[in-house]
Amino acid sequence: MSAPATTTARVLAFSARRSNGETRRPRAPTRATPASSSSTSSSDGEVPRRAALLAPGVLAAAAAASVSAPPTARAALDPTSSLTRRGMAKFVQNDVEGSIADFDLVVQNAPRMEPYMWQRGLSLYYAERYEDGAAQFRKDVAVNPNDTEEAIWAFLCDARDPKIGFDRARLTRVGPDPRRYMRAAYDLFNAGDAASDVALEDVASLGPVDEFYSLLYRGLWREAAGDAAGARDLIVEATRTQYANRSGDYMAALAVVHCKRRGWAT
């Protein structure tokens, strides 16, 4: 099995292990919280909100549909959730542009979902459409004022936008996040000092989820601040963690996509 197929299979397996997941608040169909398990829960008893919910069988159907009908016809046949999952499947396989096409169809066919399409924002970031990505994430924060990750990703888009650049003052203010690793990540992006970096590094010792997210967001911070070498070391290390290789978390796939887009060997 090829590496992209293996990654997608793990995401599918992660989805299959879910049981009775509930969303924290109204979001896109795929933003549900999977049931906790010893292998995926963090020190706070939390699981990542970005768990990829690619239902078994959806990927094969998506692949068939993508070659058998034009986008407008596929949109008429696919429910919003299937379009979203198909876009996520494409992203996992590093087909960023293809994922955007599906996510745009979701917004076109269900405009009410636009503020909740965090997946679209991530794809726009990797397509280097930073202004559009920042706008997507800020729409999310507007309806979810405690959304720490979207605030960080809006900042990351701004930092790479040549018209804006790195400016910590642009970090959107949000409420408290229940996940310790995301609170520490937000503190690093907000303060930008050595103490905050050490605090996020220390979180890594609390569990597999914490370790992965600590490495990922410390790496993303360094890249935003212009330290490409430091970013590479940390994000590549994140892709090699036990959690990244076993969980099927969408953000674990994102870390791999990040490395591929930057030309970093994992």
Regions found by a protein language model. Give the residues of each.
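Start-of-helix register in tetratricopeptide repeats
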Residues: 81, 98, 115, 149-151, ...
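N-terminal secretory signal peptides and thylakoid transit peptides that target proteins
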Residues: 43-58
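Residue-level recognition of tetratricopeptide repeat
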Residues: 88, 122, 155-158, 220, ...
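N-terminal chloroplast transit peptides
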Residues: 1-44
